[in-house]
Amino acid sequence: MSTPEFTLGIEEEYLLVDRDSLQLAEAPEALMAACRDKLEGQVSPEFLQCQIEIGTGVCAEIAEARADLRKLRSTVAAEAARFNLAPIAASCHPSADWAEQHHTDKDRYNDLEKDLGGVARRLLICGMHVHVGLDDDDLRIDLLPQFSYFLPHLLALSSSSPFWKGQDTGLASYRLTVFDNLPRTGLPPVFNSWAEYQRNIHVLIDLGLIEDSSKIWWDLRPSHNFPTLESRICDVCPRLEDTLSLAAATQALMRMLWGLKTHNMRWRAYDRFLISENRWRAQRYGARGSLIDFGRGAVVDSTELVEELIELIGADARALGGLAEVERLREIAADGSSADRQRAVRRAALEAGQSDAEAMNAVVRHLIEEFHRDL
């Protein structure tokens, strides 16, 4: 078995807000045209007109991904500013109402709205997807259930959507609550081979129910367009460095699992019922919560789990050039994710005598500042 390249690609979805009202704003065509001109196809509209999606190129290591992602974020921010707009990288706007948004008039999105109805119209959410290059088809299928064990860990550390329509949801990642209303979501099934995966997907394709595997929206999936495994579990992160830490961890986890395979070993694939419990705990409590360590048979705080994770994948992260980024996960576990920071901003605003609406606007200003901080 040849050694995979473990190339890296990162996709992020942003919301556009008016700098004065701090409410969502639709992307002007002139803004999209300017971004397309400067970013050569690395930016595109998303389902809703207030959203914008970017994607890095194929990166050999995390340093290359950092440079590309910083360029993408900087360009979008600079072009948006020309229209008195600002991007925010949070999975839900704190106070916006999905019913007031309009979807992008493209065949793909028109078909999606027609197919999914009101479920699609509620998709006022943004995510972050990480692709890791694995050329071997069967290897990608083999790693699906093994990597799934770690999906809740990544979700907890990325959580950035505590608010929905002006209310504190009590969750760290409300985005997942909205997204799970779609069909063909959640943890991936277990397949024994690439051929078995293809047979199952083609049942739906051959019946005309879906066009292709891009309509499969599992938390982790073989990409339809690239020879990659695509992790889709994460909320989008306001801070550039948080995104890079999670991407580096995803890349190192893939290499670690491949390394086990080369020694005729594998990570235990726990039942989806059990992984789903951790997925819920991550969704509910975020980076300052706790998850089940099934090997130990105990509920363990995130700070301790992150230490275990760094020990587990540290050598692989070093080999890939991303050890510093992976070690930075300690800061997220100790200080909290964006969901914790957003709640702290709102709490401080309310304690200062601001109204609920003013407090939510303070959260949006905070998200704008965090987006621009590392640029």
Curated annotation (Swiss-Prot):
What are the record keywords, sorted? ATP-binding, Ligase, Nucleotide-binding
The GO annotation for biological process reads: modified amino acid biosynthetic process
Q: Which InterPro entries match?
A: GCL_type2/YbdK_subfam, GCS2, Gln_synth/guanido_kin_cat_dom, YbdK
GO MF annotations in UniProt: ATP binding; glutamate-cysteine ligase activity
Q: What class of enzyme is it?
A: ligase
Q: Name any one Pfam family assigned in the record.
A: GCS2
Origin superkingdom: Bacteria
- What catalytic activity does the UniProt entry give for this protein? L-cysteine + L-glutamate + ATP = gamma-L-glutamyl-L-cysteine + ADP + phosphate + H(+)
Look up the EC number in the record and give it: 6.3.2.2
PANTHER family in alphabetical order:
GLUTAMATE--CYSTEINE LIGASE 2-RELATED
What HAMAP family does the annotation carry? Answer: Glu_cys_ligase_2
The record describes the protein's role as: ATP-dependent carboxylate-amine ligase which exhibits weak glutamate--cysteine ligase activity.
Q: Record's NCBIfam families?
A: gshA_cyan_rel, PRK13515.1
Annotated family: Belongs to the glutamate--cysteine ligase type 2 family. YbdK subfamily.
Q: Protein name, please?
A: Putative glutamate--cysteine ligase 2
